[in-house]
Amino acid sequence: MNILNNNLYGMDKEIYEIIKNEKLRQNNVIELIASENFVSSAVLEAQGSILTNKYAEGYPSKRFYNGCDEVDKAEVLAIERAKKLFNCKYANVQPHSGSQANQAVYLALLQPCDTILGMSLDSGGHLTHGAAPNISGKWFNTVAYNVDKETYLIDYDEIKRLAVLHNPKLLIAGFSAYPRKIDFARFREIADKVGAYLMADIAHIAGLVATGEHQSPIPYAHVVTSTTHKTLRGPRGGLILSDYEEIGKKINSALFPGLQGGPLMHVIAAKAVAFLENLQPEYKCYIKQVISNAKALAISLQERGYDILTGGTDNHIVLVDLRKDGITGKCAANSLDRAGITCNKNAIPFDTTSPFVTSGIRFGTSACTTKGFKEKDFVLIGHMVAEILDGLKNNEDNSKTEQKVLSEVKKLIKLFPFYD
């Protein structure tokens, strides 16, 4: 038997069944996890291609292995398309993830024990922005800024005060759970005042930046990092951008050989495909719809009496503060999951509960918008979510409400076919 001709079902029925069941799950739930999306069949085809066989340490035309002519072409396409999409001079498409993109920047620009200033976790920051359990919190002196205690908006005056007080080497503008726009120009002013590098982490809003629905950090940040999934709707991976070519050279060396070995050429090819899709006019319409859907969801939940953090949203993220309702984020997310609505528990600013419990939940509209959902559908989803949350108030057993909402979810999801 030639192993090269083995198909998955014949070789490994267990994994085959897992993939089949996961496809069924994705096809039968309302997916509201803000960091997830559905890629095109073209992206899947590229990522599942024979490019996975090719080892290609180094960069195009500067590899440590022979036989890289075709994968060089794929990586150059990905680089050039990324530069065009974000209107910048430098792009590195090799990071395996957004976390490793951030690590590459730290390795390129910082020394151990340098000070970094980033958003705190409960205010919406990411683990890699200096959180204690993360490598960024172990290798560097980290200082966290919070949002305003009344408005929950970024407090630029407080960031400036902390920057002057602590003199960071790197200032980070970015988030994983913040529903409003970021003023990158203000961040650059603060960075310049203390002589810091400015890194913008746009993992969540990259699609909005690429389409002009959010201010681009490229003219302001020394370096920009992102994931390539989420609103970019590509394969899971990382991306680094800059208009500073000298910084780009440092990052290239930091990523390889400093942090990674061989790049994942099948994933890079899939990134190239996604970037090409994102350069089409239809993608701008998609991002506009993502934002409109998020606003519709937020308003729907507000009308049912639920507190939306900051009073609304400017992007794909909707954060619900459940403190006054006496419901934990963990309990809400689990009950919604049983009703066919997938989201995640999420800390809210100044949250006093455990990060494994939390006082809030986070929704995102990117994935369902890819399936074709419009504002009216998200209004309906908002009412479904509210039904579940209403049922949880002073009630340990929410099973009847979960079954009722699950039947409504099934009716709605049938209107939006999945992969053929």
Curated annotation (Swiss-Prot):
Pathway: One-carbon metabolism; tetrahydrofolate interconversion; Amino-acid biosynthesis; glycine biosynthesis; glycine from L-serine: step 1/1. Its cofactor is pyridoxal 5'-phosphate. Its EC number is 2.1.2.1. The keyword Nucleus does not apply. One of its GO terms (biological process) is glycine biosynthetic process from serine. GO terms for molecular function: glycine hydroxymethyltransferase activity; pyridoxal phosphate binding. It is an enzyme of class 2 (transferase). Keywords: Amino-acid biosynthesis, Cytoplasm, One-carbon metabolism, Pyridoxal phosphate, Transferase. One of its GO terms (cellular component) is cytosol. Catalyzes the reversible interconversion of serine and glycine with tetrahydrofolate (THF) serving as the one-carbon carrier. This reaction serves as the major source of one-carbon groups required for the biosynthesis of purines, thymidylate, methionine, and other important biomolecules. Also exhibits THF-independent aldolase activity toward beta-hydroxyamino acids, producing glycine and aldehydes, via a retro-aldol mechanism. Homodimer. This is Serine hydroxymethyltransferase.
